[in-house]
A protein has these predicted regions:
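Bacterial N-terminal signal peptides
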Residues: 1-4
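Ser/Thr/Pro/Gly-biased, low-complexity, turn-/loop-rich segments
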Residues: 7-183
Length: 183
């Protein structure tokens, strides 16, 4: 059965979804809109294996992809179901619960955080309430797991806190699962 949607029912591309730098993680809740076909509009949860099911498309591999990439995958999957152009598909991250990191050590509020956007080491420190009085900002580090391996990434937060622009630009981005340690 082929569906037809008039061109007037197609929505313009969302600048927000196309320009988003957020990559999908397991546990994220996505809002998927198929303009002009309300039956296909829904929220989906990305499963622990990094996939979700979508009507007429089947299983979609989402982990590590940008929302704009998922828009293209779903559009391609819907193509055989329509006569004429496929309605505009928009994917947005409704609840980014898959991007979490921890901050431990001498900070105001140590814990695990889900900021809803990517942050660098200095922003992660701010989210955790900033350093306490005796924090050693020159010895901060990120503990990062990649498969079975563990990496330690040194972070020079001391210079960044003093306003050194070159240091601010070089701060590493916190990845999902990272632990920022402030000794």
């Amino acid at each position: 059965m082929a569906l037809s949607v008039p061109a007037a029912a197609q929505a313009p591309r969302s600048a927000n979804s196309a320009g988003s730098a957020y990559r999908i993680n397991p546990g994220d809740e996505l809002e998927i809109l198929v303009w002009g076909d309300e039956r296909l509009q829904r929220s989906v949860l990305v499963l622990p294996d990094g996939t979700f099911a979508f009507p007429l498309v089947g299983q979609v591999q989402a982990i590590g992809r940008l929302p704009a990439e998922l828009e293209r995958v779903i559009t391609a999957g819907l193509q055989p179901q329509y006569r004429g152009p496929v309605p505009q598909v928009t994917v947005s991250v409704k609840k980014p619960s898959g991007y979490q990191f921890s901050v431990i050590g001498k900070v105001g509020s140590p814990g695990t955080f889900t900021p809803g956007r990517y942050v660098n080491a200095l922003e992660a420190l701010a989210i955790a309430g900033g350093p306490t009085t005796f924090a050693n900002m020159g010895s901060a580090k990120i503990i990062r797991k990649a498969g079975d391996r563990v990496f330690v990434v040194p972070v020079r937060l001391q210079d960044a806190l003093k306003g050194d622009i070159s240091t601010l630009n070089a701060l590493p981005r916190i990845e999902s699962g990272d632990t920022l340690v402030i000794p």
